[in-house]
C-alpha cells in the first residue's frame, strides 16, 4: 500500500512539472488592445415612438338631415376645399324660400310705413295732425325697419344652413373611411362623418420616464453630459426594417406635466413629410441627437465582460502583464460602451485574446489601436 501511494505522488509531481513546462513553452498570451483616449462623444438617445398627424380634423355635419352622398374615395388624398359629403338640400332650399318671402313682406311693410311717415311729418308741423299720429307713424317705421333686419338675418341663416349641406375638407390630407352611410339621418348624436389627417408636418411622440430624466439631469449636474444650445435636439427616425427616414426633425414640444399613470413625460418631434412616406400611428425608433458626453472614455463592447460582481475589462500593464479591472459602465454608443469609472486615459484594454488571460499572466501585444470617437453612432439606453 505504501509503495502505491509513493508511486501516485511521484506521478502527480511529474504531471505538475509538465504543466509548468507547457506554460513556459507557450510564453506570453497574444492580445490585441485599444489605447484609451478621452474625447467628446455624441450622447444620442433612442426611444420607441409613434407617428401622429399634426392636424387630425374631425368632419362633422353642421345641420340635421339626410346624408345624400359621400363624394370622396375612402382612405384617399383630399385637398382643402374638396367636397366630402352632400346633405339633402331640399328642406333647406324651402327654408331659404320662406325666409326670402318673409323678407319681401317686411320690406313692403317698411316701405308703406316710410311713405306714411313722410306724409304725416309735414302735416304734424302744420298742426293738421296730432303729435300722437306722428308718434304712431314713427313707431310703425321703426318697427318695420327692425322686422326687415330680422328677416334679412333669417335669409342669411337659411343661406348658411343651405351651404352647410355641402361638406368640404378644410385641410389637405388623407381621409378616413366614412362613419355614416348614404341615406342615414344625421343629427347631433351621429354628426361625426369622417376625419382628415394632415400628412406634413408629421408629429412623432415618445415618452421619457421619470428615472431617465433624473439620470440625465444628474449627469448634466456632474458635468458628464452637455445639452445642446437652447435644448435644440435633432431627431432621426428609424423605420420598420431598419431604414432611416431621410429627413431629420426637431423636438418641438416637451410636456411640462408628469403623467402619474404612466410615470413619463411626453415629448414630440416634428418632421416634414413631402412624399407622405410617414403615416399616422406607425411605430418607429426616435434617435434624439444633440447632447454630448464630455471628455468621455469609451471602449469596444467586446472588451467589456460581466461577472458575478459586475462589469470588468482586462488591461495590459506597463510590464506587459494582464490586470483584472472592474469598471462602471454607462450607455451603449454604437459598438462601444461608455465607461464612467475604472479606466484612465492611456490604459490599454484587451479586445482580443482575453479568454486565456489570468491576473498577472504575461501577455504580448500583437495589435494596438487608439480608441476613436464615432460621431454618428447611436446611443442605446
Residue map of PLM features:
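Beta-strand/loop subdomains of soluble extracytoplasmic proteins
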Residues: 29-32, 191, 201-202, 208-256, ...
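N-terminal beta-strand block that forms a small beta-sandwich/beta-barrel module immediately after a flexible targeting
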Residues: 25-64, 241, 245-248, 252-253
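Short, solvent-exposed secondary-structure boundary/capping segments
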Residues: 164, 257-266, 335-341, 375-377
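Short beta-strand/loop micro-motif enriched in small hydrophobics and charged residues
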Residues: 235-236, 296-334, 369-381
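N-terminal export/targeting signal detector
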Residues: 1-29, 216-229, 374-381
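Exposed loop and linker-edge segments at protein-protein interfaces
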Residues: 71, 77, 83, 89, ...
Amino acid at each position: 500500500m505504501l509503495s502505491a501511494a509513493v508511486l501516485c505522488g511521484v506521478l502527480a509531481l511529474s504531471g505538475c512539472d509538465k504543466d509548468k513546462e507547457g506554460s513556459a513553452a507557450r510564453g506570453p498570451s497574444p492580445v490585441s488592445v485599444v489605447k484609451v483616449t478621452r474625447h467628446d462623444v455624441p450622447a444620442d438617445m433612442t426611444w420607441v415612438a409613434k407617428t401622429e398627424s399634426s392636424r387630425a380634423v374631425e368632419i362633422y355635419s353642421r345641420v340635421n338631415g339626410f346624408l345624400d352622398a359621400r363624394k370622396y374615395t375612402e382612405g384617399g388624398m383630399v385637398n382643402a376645399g374638396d367636397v366630402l359629403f352632400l346633405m339633402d338640400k331640399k328642406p333647406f332650399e324651402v327654408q331659404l324660400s320662406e325666409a326670402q318671402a318673409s323678407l319681401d313682406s317686411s320690406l313692403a311693410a317698411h316701405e308703406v310705413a316710410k311713405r306714411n311717415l313722410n306724409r304725416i311729418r309735414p302735416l304734424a308741423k302744420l298742426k293738421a295732425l296730432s303729435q300722437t299720429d306722428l308718434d304712431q307713424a314713427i313707431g310703425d317705421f321703426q318697427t318695420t325697419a327692425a322686422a326687415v333686419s330680422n328677416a334679412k338675418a333669417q335669409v342669411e341663416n337659411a343661406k348658411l344652413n343651405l351651404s352647410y349641406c355641402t361638406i368640404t375638407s378644410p385641410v389637405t390630407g388623407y381621409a378616413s373611411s366614412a362613419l355614416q352611410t348614404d341615406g342615414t339621418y344625421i343629427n347631433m348624436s351621429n354628426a361625426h362623418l369622417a376625419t382628415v389627417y394632415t400628412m406634413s408636418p408629421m408629429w412623432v411622440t415618445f415618452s421619457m420616464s421619470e428615472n431617465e430624466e433624473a439620470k440625465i439631469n444628474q449627469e448634466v449636474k456632474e458635468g458628464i453630459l452637455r445639452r445642446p444650445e437652447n435644448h435644440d435636439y435633432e431627431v432621426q427616425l428609424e423605420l420598420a426594417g431598419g431604414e432611416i427616414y431621410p429627413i431629420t426633425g426637431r423636438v418641438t414640444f416637451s410636456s411640462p406635466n408628469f403623467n402619474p399613470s404612466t410615470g413619463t413625460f411626453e415629448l414630440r418631434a416634428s418632421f416634414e413629410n413631402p412624399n407622405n412616406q410617414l403615416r399616422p400611428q406607425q411605430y418607429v425608433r426616435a434617435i434624439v441627437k444633440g447632447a454630448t458626453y464630455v471628455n468621455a472614455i469609451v471602449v469596444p463592447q467586446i472588451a467589456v465582460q460581466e461577472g458575478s460582481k459586475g462589469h470588468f475589462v482586462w488591461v495590459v500593464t506597463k510590464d506587459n502583464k494582464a490586470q483584472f479591472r472592474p469598471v462602471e459602465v454607462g450607455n451603449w454608443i454604437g459598438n462601444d460602451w461608455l465607461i464612467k469609472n475604472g479606466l484612465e486615459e492611456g490604459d490599454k484594454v484587451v479586445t482580443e485574446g482575453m479568454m486565456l488571460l489570468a491576473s498577472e499572466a504575461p501577455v504580448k501585444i500583437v495589435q494596438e489601436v487608439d480608441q476613436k470617437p464615432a460621431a454618428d453612432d447611436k446611443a442605446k439606453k
